[in-house]
Amino acid sequence: MTFQFQGPFSSFSSSNSIITHRCTYDVFLSFRGKDTRYNFTGDLDNALHKKGINTTFIDVDDDDLETKRDEELSETLVKAIEGSRTSVVVLSRNYASSTRCLDQLVKILECKQTKGQVVLPVFWKVDPSDVRHQRKSFGKALAQLEDNTKMQSWKTALKNVANLSGWHIARGKGQESRKLKRNFETNVLDLEMSCIFDKTVVKIHPLKQD
């Protein structure tokens, strides 16, 4: 099944969806750098910035991160996610092989529950059901981390994010893929403009695409 966002975003069913705390950023981007930094996520980040939407992210594949302690990164990560109005989670083939990506996801879903943060999952050339049930690349990645004490929280987070209404960009022709990317960028812009200027509550509806 391929999901699309129905716009404009006009209502949200959960009472937790209204964000009452002050936000430093409009959008936090969670992604695996080597998969999408120089295509989908990079394009989305540029498109949002051009519209004046303030984004933030921590690229887990950035070489500069090797010099930082885990505690320092964790503190930076928590502040970035908690200070964001919306999180876009780009789930790609190698996402689950990064413990830092998985930790981001756990924190994002925590903020969804406690702060009403809007979470938009993007399934970038992966099947949502494989994310939900940890199959294929997601299952293989977690198998290599099996002795980690955070395993259950990671599995729960992957299952929960895959159950959210989201956007599935499957493997396909270049023109079709670019069109889906543009449509997603437009819908995120609509969402952010609604939250920032109209102060309306937002709802995302999954639509099945034949």
Describe these PLM feature segments:
Residues 1-210:
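Intracellular innate-immunity NLR/STAND receptor architecture
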